[in-house]
Amino acid sequence: MTQTSYVLNYWNIPGRGESIRVILALGGIKFENNFVPLPLPLENPENQSPPPFDDGTWGKLKPHTPWGTLPTILLPSGETIGQQRAILRYLGKLIKHEGNYLYPEDPETSARVDGF
């Protein structure tokens, strides 16, 4: 089944997801933010071992990510891309700004872009 927009999965903080959100907005690409609760320790008044963590969202999502990390982006095709830089490169090859793709084809120029 094909979806109609992109789905960005990232923690409920700006972090590495923010640059992806900016590029999607710059390109006018519709996307859904799927904010994943941070898996931080919760209060542990009963000294449970191991201490309780988040609501379980990340534990359920993690096995379905390409590298067991966030951010990921679910493409309209149903394919999932993981890792911030891979996502940014993908989007940079899709999105034009002032007539030019955001990610250059020239190896030297693209290396400079990767250096940022």
Name each model feature, range by range.
Residues 2-116:
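GST-like domain detector, emphasizing the conserved glutathione-binding G-site
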